[in-house]
Amino acid sequence: MAAKPGIPKGTRDFSPVEMAKRNYIFNTIRDVFHLFGYQQIETPSMENLSTLMGKYGDEGDKLLFKIQNSGDYFNGITDEELLSRNAVKLASKFCEKGLRYDLTVPFARYVVMHRDEISFPFKRYQIQPVWRADRPQKGRYREFYQCDADVVGSNSLLNEVELVQMIDRVFGKFGVRVSIKINNRKILTGIAEIIGEADKIVDITVAIDKLDKIGLENVNAELASKGIPQEAIDKLQPIILLSGSNEEKLETLKTVLATSEAGLKGVEESEFILKTVSALGVKSEVELDLTLARGLNYYTGAIFEVKALDVQIGSISGGGRYDNLTGVFGMDGMSGVGISFGADRIFDVLNQLDLYPKEAVNGTELLFVNFGDKEAAYCLPILTKVREAGVRAEIYPDASKMKKQMGYANDKQIPFVAIVGENEMNEGKLTLKNMTTGEQSLVTPDELLAVVKA
Amino acid sequence: MAAKPGIPKGTRDFSPVEMAKRNYIFNTIRDVFHLFGYQQIETPSMENLSTLMGKYGDEGDKLLFKIQNSGDYFNGITDEELLSRNAVKLASKFCEKGLRYDLTVPFARYVVMHRDEISFPFKRYQIQPVWRADRPQKGRYREFYQCDADVVGSNSLLNEVELVQMIDRVFGKFGVRVSIKINNRKILTGIAEIIGEADKIVDITVAIDKLDKIGLENVNAELASKGIPQEAIDKLQPIILLSGSNEEKLETLKTVLATSEAGLKGVEESEFILKTVSALGVKSEVELDLTLARGLNYYTGAIFEVKALDVQIGSISGGGRYDNLTGVFGMDGMSGVGISFGADRIFDVLNQLDLYPKEAVNGTELLFVNFGDKEAAYCLPILTKVREAGVRAEIYPDASKMKKQMGYANDKQIPFVAIVGENEMNEGKLTLKNMTTGEQSLVTPDELLAVVKA
């Protein structure tokens, strides 16, 4: 007998129920993307390694899945090189292609290749799997979907406003209460400027983030332990203790950052986004949060992050503004802003809060039990008509034992079962069983349709 | 400057318009799958090579994309092995994983791994890309989507009937006239039996298929040239000349195959499928076609193939009944029947016949022109309301030149544009331009919504 098959570690099969839930998530997000004028693209799973390498740092390069060249992959490699066993160096000889690591680099590559046919500003979304040779662990997979929306070729803050509205609408549709956190890279730059410690900005945000947990004294001690001079720590006090409404925070920052051009610009941008969003009436809480420091190497303006309020889990969505998407491919000045929805975490959140609508599962609504050839022949035209009316329906294909057929209906959570034997055929009717209530009734085909569609 | 980036040969980017069309195709098929009780699964892109190797013949093994092991892939390979440069043999040392080559083997693997949680008969569909290191050529790609529906764990011919109904409904929805060809492996076995030439069945079907083109004499000559004795060719005459309605063909076959148990079984199965399908009223032409010989190594009963009637192109869908899906993984007796829709060819057919409905493109319905901050601020609440009403709408994010903004509307084929300047703001109205007719009218926000939604 063949060995029992398995799947590579860090990968997953998605069963029908999981798929239905995932489709509900992606379709909901997709509808919002369309509502805001975003258009879908897809890029190949495989990219040339020359496109991928060097874009994610040394660590990222190691995590790329590389595809062995077809045919004689030893071609062009000397014996000496082979015996050197230099896995990193020879990878580029054995392999010309790799699996995409994220959606951003392929998007940048796409924009450069298709620049002449794209009408900018280009609002694109992309929902595709990515692959990373990470050590698999709970909640971290080697293959997972990313779900990104970006608009490139526009510096307007209206794009940031729209993205906040989109986040608000997506989670509103899901019924998940979220807090949308906003920061701005320029504010962080301003803070670094006024205290003269540009390279300590991450240490500072990490320390400030602990204020609630460890208190002001300990925050200041941590800052000192990171080598930040007392004078700078003194200047940081109003920022560490920043509180109140977004408006109050912004007013404080205007004073503190008065001498930093970048800082004031960041405050102004944040003010516009927060005011406009608030005027347009989003339902989620939107909060200026200076401790938000995701993607600092990459983001140049607004930074977003979304936290679920009723589930303990990391951020379920995030993004920001960047200045130069395509510079690595020799095309400068392509700024943009984007967000990414974390499908796996959203899946977990909706599961924990039990928020999947029943319709989302898209399953069979009506099963015809099969008692034999004659009964099946009686059912088939009715089944065909029922489907014609848009009802998802099936007949159990074999005349198996009743128990097995009802078990099938239960497993597939089919809400209605039609049963046809001698009596029903003689009367031109069917017995319709409501699987939820257990109720049974003798109905005509038209009545059956009315009940099931109700 | 960095080199201009490209993509691996045989792969494709899908632009927004292509994506919208592809989504229309997949969503249409998906809806039909759901209507018939099929449920979606997804399997990982990467499978263990032990799962994939040996399933597609030697040629197929060569066409698998193999993924280089992470870390030190030289581990466990001796210097002698390296210097042997045996690319085929060492591939299994360098690589443990490969990209999926089709959806059937991963499905079989899935069924074996999840047998205890599946409620049989299991009606599953799967729409995912597959990868083959084929030589790229026109219409043949190294990455392409397959779209398969199978039901396993049931021998009932009602499954075959349903699949024909599904094919009929899918192409009916597309508006593509098709001919659904049906054959049965057992009929072909019967033919081989009565003439005593079991290994010549492919030669025979190929020769018969040429009847219309080259005439009976040449068909017989070709059969003789393939080493089929005259006596056998004589017996084949009624089969070569088989014509008339499906009923007439079946009657002839009953006589010709009278001494073959398998042959008669095949006739009986075909008769049931054709009669039942016809009684249920499919719209497509359904034809018994003995020259249909796809997947003869694999199919054991019914064989299907779908041809578009109004476009010159290969089959756009096909499938059949198989006896033992999971035997290669040590689980016997799992018979099933399935069909596969050829997405790329269907895409071409719908393009050639111009059959994409306008709604399929899902694009923006209304663009607000942006004349500046004040005008944008006036538009934003209206835009928000319009979206609230389900209209896909956007505002041009920058106050660019009118020409550029109108060009954007044209490129995205946006049917309505709202223009707001001083006058409109003073009157609390908007100028709405119908981009198809060129008509302009001054409307209130409510009137705008009514026109755009109409």
UniProtKB/Swiss-Prot annotation, chains A, B:
Keywords per UniProt: Aminoacyl-tRNA synthetase, ATP-binding, Cytoplasm, Ligase, Nucleotide-binding, Protein biosynthesis
Q: Which protein family is named in the record?
A: Belongs to the class-II aminoacyl-tRNA synthetase family.
* Keyword Protein biosynthesis part of the UniProt annotation: yes
SUPFAM superfamilies in the cross-refs: Class II aaRS ABD-related, Class II aaRS and biotin synthetases
Identify this protein by name.
Histidine--tRNA ligase
Molecular functions (GO terms): ATP binding; histidine-tRNA ligase activity
Which locations, inside or outside the cell, does it occupy?
Cytoplasm
How the protein assembles, per its UniProt entry? Homodimer.
Q: Which domain of life is it from?
A: Bacteria
Q: Does the keyword DNA damage apply?
A: no
Grouped into one coarse class, the protein's main location is cytoplasm
Q: Which reaction does it catalyse?
A: tRNA(His) + L-histidine + ATP = L-histidyl-tRNA(His) + AMP + diphosphate + H(+)
EC id: 6.1.1.21
